[in-house]
Regions:
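Conserved small/polar residues in nucleotide/adenosyl-binding loops
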Residues: 235-237
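Anionic group-transfer/hydrolysis microenvironments
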Residues: 68, 91, 209
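Gly/Thr-rich phosphate-binding beta-strand-loop-beta motif of the actin/hexokinase/Hsp70
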Residues: 56-80
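Mg2+-dependent endonuclease catalytic cores in nucleic-acid-processing enzymes, primarily RNase H-like
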Residues: 76-200, 219-226, 230-233
Length: 237
């Protein structure tokens, strides 16, 4: 039967907003307890930023990566359009070597500008004696390395970035679901959430997004440094 307003208010005060949304508002975000980006994703949906975001050939495409050795590698394809970050495409696979991903990039037929990779690209592969960055270079992929930050700092960078994003609803289905699902586990015994996010199928796409967010933050910092150096050199002329 119908639930009256007083019962709904009482339920909200007992359950908390997320569980209430799940029970009474059919909220998809509400299904994930401890959701890290849930509220931000809801806001993106409300603002129609998760929609058709077609590739604009007049802008180059950039990529941000999470690289796994034996598990998944995830790639986000995005375009910087003014202040906005248009995430137009995504790809994930597992147990594939670098040539596979280089081929995927070729097949997509985008004009690429830069590729941002995680810091572990510089680790040496004992089987080949080369770093994965060197292997990528030989395949025509020149990577910039995102700074090594704590997971929490990376999550903070993502939270700063998401309000600037538009995400393609067709090409980024798994990425969107991963954003919704990404969460911290609840410790019943201590009645609190673990500080680290739960590692599961949603981790790889979210790690690629962290690479993107921290890479862009670093770029901003580098640009400020360059401007400061230029300013100082003018002063000393």
């Amino acid at each position: 039967g119908l639930v009256d307003d007083d019962e709904l208010k009482a339920a909200l005060s007992v359950m908390g907003q997320a569980t209430y949304n799940q029970e009474f508002e059919c909220s998809f975000i509400g299904n994930v307890k401890g959701s890290i980006y849930g509220e931000l994703i809801s806001k993106l949906e409300d603002e129609k930023r998760i929609a058709r975001v077609p590739h604009d050939p007049s802008y180059p495409v950039n990529t941000a990566w999470d690289l796994g050795y034996n598990d998944s590698t995830a790639i986000l394809f995005y375009q910087n359009v003014g202040h906005a970050i248009n995430i137009i495409d995504s790809y994930e696979n597992n147990n594939k070597a670098f040539p596979h991903y280089a081929q995927i990039l070729k097949e997509k037929d985008y004009t690429y500008n830069e590729h941002i990779g995680p810091h572990d690209l510089d680790q040496t592969d004992f089987a080949t004696g080369r770093t994965r960055r060197e292997v990528a270079y030989q395949l025509g992929l020149r990577f910039k390395i995102a700074p090594k930050l704590s997971i929490e700092d990376g999550i903070h960078a993502v939270k700063m970035l998401l309000p600037r994003c538009y995400i393609d609803v067709d090409n980024c289905k798994k990425f969107i679901n991963a954003l919704r699902h990404f969460h911290r586990m609840y410790k019943e015994k201590d009645r609190m959430y673990y500080s680290k996010p739960n590692h599961d199928w949603s981790s790889h796409m979210n790690d690629a997004l962290r690479t993107l967010a921290t890479g862009l933050e670093n770029e901003k910092f580098e640009n400020v440094k360059v401007r400061q150096q230029q300013y100082m050199s003018l002063i000393h002329i």
